Amino acid sequence: MAALPVLAVTSGEPAGVGPELCARLLARDWPARLVVLGDADLIAARAAAVGSPIAVRHYSRGQAQAAGVLEVLHIPLAEPSDAGRLAVGNARYVLALLDRALAGCVGGEFAGMVTAPVHKGVICESGIAFSGHTEYLAEHTATPLVVMMLVGGGMRVALATTHLPLAAVSAAITRPVLEQTLRILHADLVQRFGIAAPRILVAGLNPHAGEGGHMGREEIEVITPVLDRLRAEGLQLVGPLPADTLFAPHTLAHGDAVLAMYHDQGLPVLKHASFGGGVNVTLGLPVIRTSVDHGTALDLAGSGRADPGSLYAAVELAVSMAEARARQPR
C-alpha cells in the first residue's frame, strides 16, 4: 500500500481565520497526512475559543501519524496575537511559515503545500515588500513565470494576466508571455491533474474576440499566432473565443480548462458558481501549491462562523495533484 502524501498547511495571518480553520481539519478523515505550520498554542487556543477544543501534537518527520490529533509543526509567534487585531510584529512569523513549508516541499518532506490567507498590508507595513503568496513563492524558487488558476464550480480558469489595471492588460499580453503561459498550463494539466491530452479554451481579449479586427487587433496580432504555433506542436487549443459565450455550459463541456486574458474576465463566473468553495492554484512552480480563495476575514476571526469549505477544497485538490504527480513516469 502506497504511503499517504504528506501536505504542509500554513495557518497564515494569526489574527485572521486561518488558525481556527486549520483546527477544523480534524473534522474530516483525509487521504493524506496533514501537517499544520504555526504556533501550536495559538491554534489550540483559537480552537477552544470557538467551542471546538482539539488535541495538538508537535510534528516530527520520523514520527508515525496519530489519529485524532492535529499535527502542528510548531513555529512560535513573534508576539501575542488576538483574533481580529493585526500586529506588525508577526509579519516575519507569517513568512517563516511559508519559508518552512517551501523548504519542506523542495526537500521532499512534503508532497505539496496548502496556504491559509495572509494580510499583505501588515507585511508591507513591517518593511517587507510583499505582493502575495504567488509572487513570493515564484521569487524564492527562481521561477520566472507562474500562472494563477482558480478551480471550482466544475471549472478550471487560468489567467494570462493577474492583478493589473485594465488599462495595462493589453500591453502585458505579449506573444512570449502568452506562449509560455499556455505551455505551463498545458504541462501542469498533464502532470498534476492527470489529463493526458488537455483541451484548453482560450478567450479573446476584446468583445466578440475582436470581431475580425474591428474591435481590437490583439486577437489577430498576438493571440492567434501563438495558438497556431502551439497547435503545430500538438497542443489542443480552441480560440480565441468570445468571452461572453465561452462560459456557456455547452462550450465548457468541450474543454478541460479556460485561459482568460485578465482577472475580471474569467473569475466572476467561477466565483459565482463556487463562492466559498473555490481553490487558487499556482501553476509553474516546482512544488504543488493550493490556497483558499478568500482573505483573512478579520471580522470573523474568533467567532467560529468562518466557513472551512474553501480550505477543505484546497486540501482535496492538493491531495489529488500530489497523487497525479506520483503516477507520472519518473
Swiss-Prot record:
GO cellular component annotations of the record:
cytoplasm
Q: Which GO terms describe its molecular function?
A: 4-hydroxythreonine-4-phosphate dehydrogenase activity; cobalt ion binding; magnesium ion binding; NAD binding; zinc ion binding
What are the recorded Gene Ontology BP terms? pyridoxal phosphate biosynthetic process; pyridoxine biosynthetic process
Q: Which UniProt keywords apply?
A: Cobalt, Cytoplasm, Magnesium, Metal-binding, NAD, NADP, Oxidoreductase, Pyridoxine biosynthesis, Zinc
Question: Any idea which positions bind substrate?
Answer: H133, T134, K271, N280, R289
Q: Where in the cell is it found?
A: Cytoplasm
Q: How is the cofactor bound?
A: Binds 1 divalent metal cation per subunit. Can use ions such as Zn(2+), Mg(2+) or Co(2+).
Instruction: Quote the record's binding site residues for a divalent metal cation.
Output: H163, H208, H263
Recorded hits in Pfam families, A to Z, give: PdxA (PF04166)
Q: EC annotation? A: 1.1.1.262
Per its UniProt record, the required cofactor names are: Zn(2+); Mg(2+); Co(2+)
Primary localisation category: cytoplasm
* InterPro entries per record: PdxA (IPR037510), PdxA_fam (IPR005255)
Reaction(s) the record says it catalyses: 4-(phosphooxy)-L-threonine + NAD(+) = 3-amino-2-oxopropyl phosphate + CO2 + NADH
Please name the pathway.
Cofactor biosynthesis; pyridoxine 5'-phosphate biosynthesis; pyridoxine 5'-phosphate from D-erythrose 4-phosphate: step 4/5
The UniProt record lists the keyword Ribosomal protein:
no
Q: Is Oxidoreductase found in the keyword set?
A: yes
Question: Its function?
Answer: Catalyzes the NAD(P)-dependent oxidation of 4-(phosphooxy)-L-threonine (HTP) into 2-amino-3-oxo-4-(phosphooxy)butyric acid which spontaneously decarboxylates to form 3-amino-2-oxopropyl phosphate (AHAP).
Q: How does it assemble?
A: Homodimer.
Task: Describe the family membership recorded for this protein in Swiss-Prot or TrEMBL.
Answer: Belongs to the PdxA family.
Q: What else is known?
A: The active site is located at the dimer interface.
Q: What is this protein called?
A: 4-hydroxythreonine-4-phosphate dehydrogenase
